[in-house]
């Protein structure tokens, strides 16, 4: 039996709300981590910061190359990609302020 279009619209609206809530939680989590790392005190262009975050994401996904600060068509995170285990602290070799 097929669902009526009104039920499908209700389900889509419910799922969009769930997606918005999940994205908000993720953004707040990343924001808290960025503030703890001191990024709130650094004067940096938004495009540069975007590129740095993309580099970090590639590092944890196991990719290589530098980011441009712009999203490519088809770039999306589904949550199904595995994360690579990376060292933390001084051995991480991540972003640092000179």
From Swiss-Prot:
Keywords assigned by UniProt? Answer: Conjugation, Plasmid
Q: Specify residue ranges for compositional bias: Polar residues.
A: 75-88
Say if the entry is tagged with keyword Nuclease: no
**Does the entry feature the keyword Transmembrane helix, yes or no?**
no
Positions of region (Disordered): 60-98
Q: What is the protein's name according to its record?
A: Conjugal transfer protein TraC
Instruction: Name its species.
Output: Rhizobium radiobacter
What gene name is given for the protein in this entry?
traC
């Amino acid at each position: 039996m097929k669902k009526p279009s009104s039920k499908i619209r209700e389900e889509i609206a419910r799922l969009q709300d769930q997606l918005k809530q999940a994205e908000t939680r993720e953004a707040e989590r990343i924001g808290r981590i960025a503030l703890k790392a001191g990024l709130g005190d650094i004067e940096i262009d938004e495009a540069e910061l975007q590129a740095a975050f993309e580099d970090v994401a590639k590092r944890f996904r196991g990719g290589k190359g530098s980011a441009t600060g712009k999203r490519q068509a088809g770039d999306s995170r589904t949550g199904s990609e595995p994360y690579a285990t990376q060292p933390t602290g001084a051995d991480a070799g991540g972003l640092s302020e000179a």
